[in-house]
């Protein structure tokens, strides 16, 4: 079994490609099940966010695994494999695990150290677990990765004052207008990104904020937190006519701000308008950028502002990379030890069988034993067995991560009289449990 990651992100693919390869939340479970049915795929988790679509899989062979992951992606999004292949990356084994640690801790994000990705990875794992597309390896890996990322954010504080996409949006507005005093802003969407934008706008001098959302109650909840107004979704263009700055972040699958409508609007509008689209797929038609006085920015346009990270935070990243390498080594040592689990179980079962035979013999030879005495003798005998096996089992685990592990394990089985049949029976039981 091998761990293989395939994906595309803000490093490898522009936004016009990424927005075509996003798994809809309503289709997550179906995508997981469909991928699980592909040849070579033993386990899988799909992570799909505004900046990345990645699949973490356990495969029986690397080469065939790569092919079937690509085929699944092409079939799911109804695109030619040759069209998406140039934007894909692959990580195998240690590189795949290392990458997942960095992603979950926010070290690979457009926003260094951001915490949103931790929740997204955790959500992706929970959905996969509920859908039964994870097993022994990915269950262990994702639990370790999520725990590590939580510790990173708690102990290093890398997320404190982290430059966010929403922060970058506000900085772009300041560069265009200078002071934001008396500027009118319209937020289209009432999700997490809109809330982050409002937090960054606090204290910037903007007093006139209108929130527009298809579900009005969500807009009202957000407006109450930030003393903003609520506008009717059906009257969006009327609000845009009065706006200086528009920030758009919705989960719509298609653009909600169209070029034709904006062309008419800008011909009537007396002033310029800054429109920042942080949706993925994009919420504003790209052709709007050609309209005079319509200043359009998308997520990739904000990357330059976001990349201005402090030296202190970059120092933390270097330190974390060493820690991550140690975590990765620990994971693969654990994986190697999985191979001796059937041997350990076979050894324990053989010892318990011997105990049972001995207790039966004792009962026959000492019929006068009370039930309490019989139970006490059994407990003491089991304790002796556990003490006797503790050191050999510990040594076996150590041997399992050494170069000549196979030879050492065979010697161990011979010493304790464990046949191939003893071990194979346990292995079959484990396989049936996983399936």
Curated annotation (Swiss-Prot):
Disulfide bonds: none annotated. GO terms for molecular function: glutamyl-tRNA reductase activity; NADP binding. It comes from the Bacteria. InterPro entries: 4pyrrol_synth_GluRdtase (IPR000343), 4pyrrol_synth_GluRdtase_dimer (IPR015896), 4pyrrol_synth_GluRdtase_N (IPR015895), GluRdtase_CS (IPR018214), GluRdtase_dimer_dom_sf (IPR036453), GluRdtase_N_sf (IPR036343), NAD(P)-bd_dom_sf (IPR036291), Shikm_DH/Glu-tRNA_Rdtase (IPR006151). It holds the Pfam family GlutR_N. The keyword Oxidoreductase applies. PROSITE patterns: GLUTR. Substrate binds at residues 49-52, 109, 114-116, 120. It catalyses: (S)-4-amino-5-oxopentanoate + tRNA(Glu) + NADP(+) = L-glutamyl-tRNA(Glu) + NADPH + H(+). The keyword NADP applies. Catalyzes the NADPH-dependent reduction of glutamyl-tRNA(Glu) to glutamate 1-semialdehyde (GSA). During catalysis, the active site Cys acts as a nucleophile attacking the alpha-carbonyl group of tRNA-bound glutamate with the formation of a thioester intermediate between enzyme and glutamate, and the concomitant release of tRNA(Glu). The thioester intermediate is finally reduced by direct hydride transfer from NADPH, to form the product GSA. Belongs to the glutamyl-tRNA reductase family. This is Glutamyl-tRNA reductase. The gene is hemA.
